[in-house]
Amino acid sequence: MSETRAVLRGVRLSVDKGRLVADLIRGKKVDQALNVLQFTQKKAAVIIKKVLESAIANAEHNDGADIDELKVKTIYVEQGATLKRFTARAKGRGNRISKPTCHVYVTVGN
């Protein structure tokens, strides 16, 4: 039983929004997971789909795995660094804008 993983770090996406999509495909077969992501209208779905496709390609190339038997073993989204920016407000003030990033980890296996 081999497991292969793919990682995407520093994605410009909120952790909560990424976890919503990750919960949809956890434990599913990879073809079913790709189908779910194809029809999920979220920015996170496009990002996670690319990471899942990378994990599938890694499993096929590095381990010689059969794609039809692969399942999404683990998928999790962790918080990354937050970019802090300022925007101008009235009367010479400024407000902070947080631009969160996250890291996406996908593991596929039999």
Curated annotation (Swiss-Prot):
One of its GO terms (biological process) is translation. The keyword Metal-binding does not apply. Keywords: Ribonucleoprotein, Ribosomal protein, RNA-binding, rRNA-binding. InterPro entries: Ribosomal_uL22, Ribosomal_uL22_bac/chlpt-type, Ribosomal_uL22_bac/org-type, Ribosomal_uL22_CS, Ribosomal_uL22_sf. PROSITE patterns: RIBOSOMAL_L22. Transmembrane segments: none annotated. The keyword GTP-binding does not apply. GO terms for cellular component: cytosolic large ribosomal subunit. Pfam families: Ribosomal_L22 (PF00237). One of its GO terms (molecular function) is structural constituent of ribosome. This protein binds specifically to 23S rRNA; its binding is stimulated by other ribosomal proteins, e.g. L4, L17, and L20. It is important during the early stages of 50S assembly. It makes multiple contacts with different domains of the 23S rRNA in the assembled 50S subunit and ribosome. The globular domain of the protein is located near the polypeptide exit tunnel on the outside of the subunit, while an extended beta-hairpin is found that lines the wall of the exit tunnel in the center of the 70S ribosome. NCBIfam families: rplV_bact. Belongs to the universal ribosomal protein uL22 family. Part of the 50S ribosomal subunit. This is Large ribosomal subunit protein uL22.
